[in-house]
Amino acid sequence: IENEINSKTLTDNPHKIIFDVLTELKHNLSLLSYCLENKNCIDDVKSKSFSRSLKAIYILQSSLNMKAGGEIAENLFNLYDYCRTTIIKSFTKQDHEEIKKLIPIVSEILDGWKTIKN
């Protein structure tokens, strides 16, 4: 994610970067859920989807302007934090069910983000 984001910062606008990060988060959550459910998944793929999911959440939380964003920014921060803790707990327990529940949440944020004019 970092290399993609770093190369995009020179050409893309912030709206597009957040869109890409949300898309990447959704993809990696799906991949992580699949890997946790299917024990024959390669450990490297599982580990990378875990770490990329956490990096995406860090980027999303770091991008929030808490002062200007007010309650919306605070709610998003808390939602991202919920996702982060759920990912860590689920990865530790090797439980895909809770990860699956995060995908519609991220999808809803992504759908909302698509409606914002940049």
Predicted segments, located by residue:
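Amphipathic, charged alpha-helical scaffolds that flank and support histidine-based chemistry
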Residues: I87-I103
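Short terminal interaction segments
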Residues: I1-D20, K101-N118
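Alpha-helical segments in soluble extracytoplasmic regions
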Residues: Y34-L60
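Amphipathic alpha-helix face/heptad-repeat signature
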Residues: P14, I18-L25, K46-R52, I72-L79, ...
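Short, charged, low-complexity loops and linkers
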Residues: E2-H15, S33-N40, S62-M66
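Short, solvent-exposed, charged loop/turn and helix-capping segments
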Residues: I59-E74
